[in-house]
């Protein structure tokens, strides 16, 4: 295992097309990168979604031995196996309900239920699994996490049909409601293409950096702009030239190649 460097990647829109499986074309640059650095996958999704989308890499590839899994913004940390007989080991996790207290958590859930009922008047499809509590964060998906690709596309079309996108309007409203009840101790961000992430202040993706204080960290993600869930960690590492914003898996390929070359040059 490389102790000096680790490159952290967002998942959806970075290593995979949104809500789809790992792009196998990235095996080539990632294998080259792994000679010089460990790999981390930091995502707002929970472990089950990460495992499902990244199965080709973390179950059936030798890269599993150098790849850290950091679901829920890195508030959970799964250490890579040391040999072919081992599995990933959960070595750190946090609990949002305990951190905020039962009353604040209950208020949050009530706000999200109200917001979901209000969103039902729009013309996008409704499926199921609208609110997902992941231990250290809450994900609210108005179209439902059970939505098919086609249903997600319909939601995006409705979202973007307004002069101010529907999710951005809802984001402002939701932040106002949450701050009134939780004294500005809770953050609400856009999550991926269709949802919202809700978590305690400070539990954004910069949390993942706390697991690697003895290493140089890089980050590659696609949601690095205002309201995006990659913004904080991107901004933090960009100050040192180690934050990269990608437009998709093809761009990620080029970024990995650049980081690898920089690491090689650094050793010369």
At which residue positions do the language-model features occur?
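Short, solvent-exposed loop/turn segments at secondary-structure junctions
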Residues: 47-48, 76, 144-147, 194-195, ...
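A short, Lys/Arg-enriched amphipathic alpha-helix followed by its capping loop at the start of a domain
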Residues: 3-8, 24-37, 177, 181, ...
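Short beta->alpha linker loops
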Residues: 21, 45, 135, 193, ...
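Short loop/turn segments at strand-loop or loop-helix junctions that form parts
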Residues: 7-12, 71-74, 81-83, 134, ...
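Active-site phosphate-binding/coordination module
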Residues: 21-127
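Conserved acidic, metal-coordinating active-site core of Asp-based
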Residues: 123-218
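Mg2+-dependent phosphoryl-transfer enzymes with acidic/Ser/Thr/Gly-rich catalytic loops
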Residues: 2-6, 22-23, 197-268
